[in-house]
Amino acid sequence: MASNLPQERNHEACLLIRDLDPMVTESLLMELFIQAAPVVKVFIPKDKLTQQHSGRAYVEFQSSSDAEYALKVMKFVRLFNKEIKIKKENKDKVDIGANLFIGNLDADVDERILHDTFSRFGTIIFTPKVMRDENGVSKGFAFINFDSFEASDAAIEAMNSQFLCNKPISVTYARKKDSNERHGSSAERIIAASRNTGYLNQQQQQQSSSTSSTSTISTSTPQQQQQQQSQPLPPPIVTAGGIIHQQQIQQQQQLQQQQQQQLQLQQLQLQQLQQQQQQQQQQQQQQQQQQQQQQQQQQQQQHHPHHQHPIPHPHPLPHQLRPHPHPHHPPPPPFNPMLMQFNPMMMPFGGMPPPPPHK
C-alpha cells in the first residue's frame, strides 16, 4: 500500500498516521494538521477494488522541524472517538512484523471470529482482514498482525491444523510484499527487538521530560507563564468523534451566508416576475376594455344611421333669437298673430285698460 506513494516526497518531513477510522478523509487530515504547521500534501493509500483505506495515512510538511512540532502537538488526538497513532516515517523502512497467514477458512468465518479466536495469544495491531471477492464472498484466507513474535509463535503452535467452523485451518507466517521470503526469520526478530528497545527508551525519555516540564511550570515566573500561554495550543478535541475548529466553523458560516444571499436573490427575482406578470395583466385588461368600447361604439353607429353625416360639414352657430335652419331639421313655422287665442282672464279687472290721458 505504501508503494503507491510518490517517491519525490521528503521523508524527513513526513509523518505516518495509523489507526484511522474508515470515515477519515484526506481533506479532514489536511484541515487537522494545517493547524499545527504548513502541510504540503496528504496521502491515504486505498485498495484498488474496494476504494477503502486500511487506517494509515501520510502527511508531508514543509520541513522536518514542522513535522516534529506537529508530532508533539497532535499526540492523543481522537478522530471519531478513536485515538490516532502518529510517528515519523523511516525512509529505510523494512517490511518487518509478526504477520500471519490463515488459510483453508470456512465461508462462515469472518473478522470477528478471527479476532475473538486469536486475540488470546497477544495484542492484534490491525483488525484481521478476510480476503473477499467482488461479491463479498470469502476467498478462504486471511491475515493477522500481532505486535510481537512471541504472540505469533504461540498462535501458530496452538491453532495450526485446528478446526474452525468445521474446517481445519493452516496458520503460518505470511510472505513479504517485495520478496518470496516469509516473516519470522531470525534477522527480522533481531531488528524488531532493537526497535522495541528504542521505542521503550523514547517513551521513558518522554515521561521524564513531561515530569520535568510539570515541575518547571510550577516554579516558573509570571513572565515565563505568559510566554507559555502565548504558544500555539493543540486543536480542540470532541470526545463524541470528529474535531471542530475555527476553519470548519468559518466555512459553515460562509456557506450559510451564501445560501441566505442566494435565497434573497431568488426572492427578489420572484417579486420582479410577479410585478411583470401583474403589469402584463393590467395591460391586457386595458386592451380588452378599449376593444369593448370600440365594439359598443360600432354597434351604436349601426343602430342609428341617421346620426351619421355622409359628408362632413361644419355646423353654423345658432342665432340668438331663433335657431338656424339645419338640413336635417325643418325650420319652425312663421309667427301668425291671428292664431293666438284671446283670454280675458289674462286682462286686468274692469276690462280693457283706459287710454292714456291727453296732454
UniProtKB/Swiss-Prot annotation:
Q: Which organism is it from?
A: Dictyostelium discoideum (Social amoeba)
Report the superkingdom from the record. Eukaryota
Q: Which UniProt keywords apply?
A: mRNA processing, mRNA splicing, Nucleus, Repeat, RNA-binding, Spliceosome
Enumerate composition-biased segments (Low complexity): 202-231, 293-302
**Biological process GO annotation list?**
mRNA splicing, via spliceosome
Q: Which family does it belong to?
A: Belongs to the SF3B4 family.
Q: Which GO terms describe its molecular function?
A: RNA binding
Q: Which SMART domains match?
A: RRM
Kindly list the residue ranges recorded as spanning the membrane.
none
Q: How does it assemble?
A: Component of splicing factor SF3B which is composed of at least eight subunits.
Where does the UniProt annotation locate this protein?
Nucleus
Tell me the segments the record calls region Disordered.
198-239, 293-337
Name of the protein this chain belongs to: Splicing factor 3B subunit 4
Keyword field contains Ribosomal protein:
no
Pfam (any one): RRM_1
